[in-house]
Regions:
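Extracytoplasmic/periplasmic, Sec-exported soluble proteins
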Residues: 14-25, 42, 46, 65, ...
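Append "and occasionally in soluble cytosolic enzymes with long acidic Gly/Pro-rich linkers
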Residues: 1-31, 35, 146
């Protein structure tokens, strides 16, 4: 199977923090993009420098990671609103503030709100505001799906992998449980 390659595609840099695992992912991305004629260099930064560079938007592509603060999908979604301190992708900020290329239609949810060629604040921020203010669980989850669709359609966020926790547990241990967030609790456990 022939692979078409881009020509005259601008080179880019992938920013990541120091870790053999993060470097390996960067090398994989570099190799995968090279197959399409895209040149990507890798830039490694120490953790604090990396965080500052990312927060200031001083990158083309950067590694990001997130673990939920609490067991609710909004923990992964509200970080991308314009005013969020975790919005390192710079959605709705600075040069992107007036970028009107997003669309949202909430009429199928019974909400009289439809915008085309709108800003991030008029679409994503608005939807997240509704998620945080509604008391109806079904509407709340439907709105979170709308927000997720906006985020994924932007192309700026690309989930690559999820962390997993592998552990061994003796069959003699009773009462230990794990939360969906990956925390292991032993306060009610004992050995048979």
């Amino acid at each position: 199977m022939a692979t078409k390659k881009f020509t005259d595609f601008p080179s880019m840099t992938y920013l990541y923090n120091t870790s053999d695992g993060h470097r390996a992912i960067g090398e994989y991305l570099q190799q995968a993009l090279a197959a399409y004629g895209i040149t990507m260099t890798l830039e490694n930064q120490e953790w604090n420098t990396f965080l500052e560079t990312r927060k200031n938007g001083g990158y083309t592509i950067a590694r990001n990671g997130w673990l939920a603060d609490y067991n609710d999908p909004i923990s992964f979604l509200d970080m991308w609103i314009t005013a969020s301190g975790n919005n390192d992708a710079q959605f709705g900020k600075d040069d992107h503030k007036n970028l009107a290329c997003y669309s949202v239609d909430l009429t199928s949810l019974g909400i009289d709100y439809k915008k085309t060629d709108a800003t991030w604040a008029e679409t994503y921020d608005y939807v997240i505001g509704l998620v945080k203010s509604t008391t109806d669980t079904n509407t709340r989850y439907a709105l979170m799906h709308v927000a997720e669709d906006l985020l994924m359609e932007s192309g700026a966020i690309v989930p690559l992998y999820y962390y997993t926790d592998i552990y061994m547990c003796s069959e003699k241990l009773e009462g230990m449980f794990s939360s969906p967030l990956g925390y292991n609790f032993f306060m009610y456990s004992n050995l048979k």
